[in-house]
């Protein structure tokens, strides 16, 4: 939840979810 994955999730889900990222405030974060 604190490390930005460099991906937004405004229109599509986080592709980086495969490495543990999740959507938060329209941006993908991990941890």
Swiss-Prot record:
Belongs to the cyclotide family. Bracelet subfamily. Signal peptide: none annotated. It comes from the Eukaryota. The presence of a 'disulfide through disulfide knot' structurally defines this protein as a knottin. Pfam families: Cyclotide. This is Cyclotide vpub-A. Probably participates in a plant defense mechanism. The keyword Ubl conjugation does not apply. Transmembrane segments: none annotated. It comes from Viola pubescens (Downy yellow violet). One of its GO terms (biological process) is defense response. InterPro entries: Cyclotide, Cyclotide_bracelet_CS, Cyclotide_sf. There is a cross-link at residues 1-31 (Cyclopeptide (Gly-Asn)). Disulfide bonds join 5-21, 9-23, 14-28. Keywords: Disulfide bond, Plant defense. This is a cyclic peptide.
